[in-house]
Amino acid sequence: MTRTILALFTAAALGACASKPATNEVQADLPVAKESARAGAGNNVSMRGNPVPLGGSGVVEVGKPLPAAKVIGTDLKPVDLGATTGKVRIISVVPSLDTPTCDKQTHELSEKNGGLDSSVEMITVSRDLPFAQKRFAREAKIGNVTFLSDYNMREFGDANGLTIEPLALLARAVIVVDKDNIVRYVQVVPEVTALPDMQAAMQVARGLL
């Protein structure tokens, strides 16, 4: 029974959303969330209306440093996302790149950033294998986004409170970090099958330059 429920949740989480909540605006047949859930253990997101718990030992919060977390690049080298880079960063968090909603979110980051990619570091984090991320970037012709994987140590989801507990996938979110590694914007999408408001995140990032 548990396996069946998880399979249904996975299908709901990774597919495009058929329903369009009244609080969302629609973008290319996918709803765009205007509200945010709270990250961290004890909080929930939903999958087509079904609540699922978030877990983690920490939580990402506006006004605080982005938690230290090692992820893996497409070159298989570790990267500490909590390290100060001296650049403004937009971190787009997706459950899996091989799905319509995640695909749309990543293309918007890459192609509809209004030139921010010349001065802001664009990052996508998922628990896809680095090989799958590299293939996605190549096939999508995306060269201005850094793809990082949380598949191995799973530190990013744990440190930021963004792990969907029943599935061990990352919740859908977008985070803006300033040049000093302080979180300036967080949106955790309440309904995983909806898109985050990427334009709102980009507006915040633009104001930090």
Where are the regions a protein language model picked out?
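Short acidic-hydrophobic, aromatic-tinged amphipathic segments that line or gate anion-handling sites
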Residues: 72, 146-150
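Thiol-/selenol-based redox modules, centered on thioredoxin-like
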Residues: 171-209
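Short, small/polar residue-rich loop motifs at catalytic or cofactor-binding pockets
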Residues: 65, 88, 169-171
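Short, basic/aromatic recognition patches
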Residues: 158-164
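Structural microenvironment flanking redox-active thiols in thiol-disulfide oxidoreductases
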Residues: 103-142, 147, 155-156
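N-terminal targeting signals for export/organelle localization
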Residues: 2-9, 13-68, 72
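Short active-site neighborhood of thiol/selenol oxidoreductases, capturing the structured segment around
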Residues: 79-109, 121
